[in-house]
Amino acid sequence: MRPNFSKGLLPAIVINEETKEVLMLAYMNEEAYEKTLKTKKTWFYSRSRQTLWNKGATSGHVQHVKSLYLDCDQDAIVITVNQVGVACHTGEKTCFHHKII
């Protein structure tokens, strides 16, 4: 089974394999997906810069891919990772650190 990239980008939810914490949400195009499969490190597509980026390439906070899951409609991906360092560019452990309720 493969993701359906017919509409372009797919949301990719990244989860810490050990703690099950949601670390971040990013977007993948087909090229980012293929690079992720090949390298076993996360690659995403930046909507603002319109280019691929490898998580941790600059900061060293890489994500080693442990598994990928595809949803029932083949239009969303969950990636479990071994996170090195923090996930959020703000320096927080996770991008989801603002509790609402």
From Swiss-Prot:
Residues where Mg(2+) binds: 71, 73, 75
Known catalytic reactions: 1-(5-phospho-beta-D-ribosyl)-5'-AMP + H2O = 1-(5-phospho-beta-D-ribosyl)-5-[(5-phospho-beta-D-ribosylamino)methylideneamino]imidazole-4-carboxamide
Amino-acid biosynthesis as UniProt keyword: yes
GO molecular function, a single term: phosphoribosyl-AMP cyclohydrolase activity
Listed pathway(s): Amino-acid biosynthesis; L-histidine biosynthesis; L-histidine from 5-phospho-alpha-D-ribose 1-diphosphate: step 3/9
Example GO BP: L-histidine biosynthetic process
UniProt remark on cofactor binding: Binds 1 Mg(2+) ion per subunit.
Keywords: Amino-acid biosynthesis, Cytoplasm, Histidine biosynthesis, Hydrolase, Magnesium, Metal-binding, Zinc
Keyword set includes Phosphoprotein: no
Binding locations of Zn(2+): 72, 88, 95
Protein's cellular compartments: Cytoplasm
One Pfam family this sequence matches: PRA-CH
EC id: 3.5.4.19
Main location (coarse class): cytoplasm
SUPFAM superfamilies referenced in this protein's UniProt entry, alphabetically: HisI-like (SSF141734)
Cofactor(s) it depends on: Mg(2+); Zn(2+)
One term under GO cellular component: cytoplasm
Function statement: Catalyzes the hydrolysis of the adenine ring of phosphoribosyl-AMP.
Family: Belongs to the PRA-CH family.
PANTHER family: HISTIDINE BIOSYNTHESIS BIFUNCTIONAL PROTEIN (PTHR42945), HISTIDINE BIOSYNTHESIS BIFUNCTIONAL PROTEIN HIS7 (PTHR42945:SF1)
Quaternary structure, from the entry: Homodimer.
Protein name: Phosphoribosyl-AMP cyclohydrolase
